[in-house]
């Protein structure tokens, strides 16, 4: 991830996943600290936390860590663990309230696959932000200034990997069209992800920041 940070340094922030697909990985808070030390400019850093694997003690320790580091928290249930058993002791809503009570900028997942009524119910929670996943048709997207749509960018280098995921993905051309549509709907931020091909995100960022495109949204990379 550190090598990617240099390539993607033009982004406004970074989102760090927590054990993607339930597989072991370096703890997000560790990577976040490495990013903070490496980047010359102050960036928004979102640390993900899988709740399936932790108890209240771990959550409170993470909240204290987030306060000290000044990072945001994205609270998710996560995929079933590839090793061991899930704890399943914490709800996203309860974890959110705990984080907010300590002044942490904390968010939740909202799925655009759900009916808009369910999306609005989710958006009624007092989260600081929401990461919107499963974006297939912008006509089914609820409107909220706290929403950050998650856009997976598909290239020749990662097409096989992304094809194995349930999340929809977009080739570079379609991703550009989608960004324009999202801006037209009033979205101020978007999270772009292209696992295995960070260079494609750098190219997309240069396109989005072109003043002739008029794209003003903040962008985050993963």
Feature names for model-found ranges:
Residues 6-7, 64-67, 121-125, 183:
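Non-catalytic positions within long, well-ordered alpha-helices that form the structural scaffold/packing
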Residues 15, 72-75, 128-132, 191:
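Conserved beta-strand positions in the central sheet of alpha/beta enzyme cores
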Residues 1, 6-8, 74-81, 86-113, ...:
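Active-site pocket-lining/capping segments in soluble small-molecule metabolic enzymes
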């Amino acid at each position: 991830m550190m090598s990617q940070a240099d390539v993607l340094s033009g982004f406004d922030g970074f989102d760090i996943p927590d054990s993607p697909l339930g597989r072991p990985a370096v703890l997000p808070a560790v990577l976040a600290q490495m990013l903070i030390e490496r980047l010359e400019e102050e960036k928004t850093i979102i640390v993900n936390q899988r709740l399936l694997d932790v108890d209240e003690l771990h959550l409170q320790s993470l909240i204290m860590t987030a306060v000290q580091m000044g990072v945001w928290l994205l609270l998710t249930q996560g995929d079933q663990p590839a090793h061991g058993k899930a704890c399943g002791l914490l709800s996203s809503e309860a974890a959110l309230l705990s984080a907010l009570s300590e002044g942490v900028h904390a968010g939740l997942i909202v799925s655009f696959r759900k009916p808009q009524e369910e999306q609005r119910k989710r958006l009624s929670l007092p989260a600081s932000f929401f990461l919107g996943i499963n974006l297939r048709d912008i006509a089914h997207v609820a409107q909220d200034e706290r929403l950050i749509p998650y856009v997976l960018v598909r290239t020749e280098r990662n097409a096989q990997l992304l094809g194995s995921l349930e999340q929809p993905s977009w080739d570079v051309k379609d991703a550009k069209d989608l960004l324009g549509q999202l801006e037209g709907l009033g979205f101020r931020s978007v999270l772009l992800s292209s696992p295995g091909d960070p260079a494609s995100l750098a190219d997309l960022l240069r396109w989005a920041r072109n003043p002739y495109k008029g794209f003003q949204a903040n962008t985050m990379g993963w």
